[in-house]
Design a protein with these regions (language model features):
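Sec-dependent N-terminal signal peptides of Gram-positive bacterial secreted proteins and lipoproteins
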Residues: 1-24
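Envelope-exposed proteins and targeting segments
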Residues: 26, 65-67, 148, 180-184, ...
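Extracellular LysM carbohydrate-binding repeats and other cell-envelope/extracellular binding modules
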Residues: 26-29, 38-77
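Surface-exposed patches in mature extracellular/periplasmic domains of secreted proteins
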Residues: 60, 95-109, 122-130, 149, ...
Length: 202
């Protein structure tokens, strides 16, 4: 197990950092049966971000039809970069006889937090001073998995550049081509160009 953990984390740290700008870009009018959790899932936004964007709601457990909920959204250029990384990874996997990884928005959210954490706390490591290891971080965000891995990078300015860098590193390449992974999340922070890829197998 220790050997597997070392392999998963043996990704060479690529040094060369997009700030996740969140703003209330849209709104949702509550209908009967809605809960904050259902709204969060519908818009692929974390529950804590929805609560933060709606300070006017004193008790998030009690929302009523007709109430207007602000929906925070990630800057579109950020999400397009993240989705392009996923597309490129899946293209590589298919060329290598592997199945595509499924986009997991909750895993993308965790990966964004990791990239932001590296920027905010000025470190570049798989181990966060705030969240611990990638595995501890995923679990603390409610992500369940059978197997998991993480790739990080800093400084690459485009999805193609970061994927090329990862593919030229044996540890990163092993994660991208790991047949046991089934889902992927990518988080990008433009300010400093921090990148995080998180993989899980269920």
């Amino acid at each position: 197990m220790k050997k597997l953990l070392v392999l998963v984390l043996s990704v060479a740290l690529i040094a060369v950092t997009f700030s996740v700008n969140v703003s209330a870009a849209t709104s949702h009018t509550v209908v009967a049966g809605d809960t904050m959790w259902k709204i969060a899932v519908r818009y692929e936004v974390g529950l804590s971000e929805i609560k933060k964007a709606n300070p006017q709601i004193s008790n998030p457990d009690l929302i009523y039809p007709g109430q207007v909920i602000n929906i925070p959204s990630t800057e579109s250029s950020v999400t397009s970069y993240e989705k392009e990384v996923i597309r490129l990874v899946n293209e590589i996997r298919v060329k290598n006889g592997l199945r595509e990884l499924k986009y997991n928005w909750e895993l993308c959210r965790v990966a964004r937090y990791k990239s932001q954490d590296m920027k905010d706390n000025r470190y570049f490591s798989h181990t966060s001073p705030v969240y611990g290891s990638p595995f501890q971080m995923m679990k603390s965000f409610g992500i369940t998995y059978r197997t998991a891995g993480e790739n990080i990078a800093k400084g690459q300015t485009t999805p193609q550049m970061v994927v090329d860098a990862w593919m030229n590193s044996s540890g990163h390449r092993a994660n991208i081509l790991n047949a046991s992974y089934t889902e992927i999340g990518v988080g990008y922070v433009a300010s400093g160009n921090y990148w995080t890829q998180m993989f899980i197998g269920k």
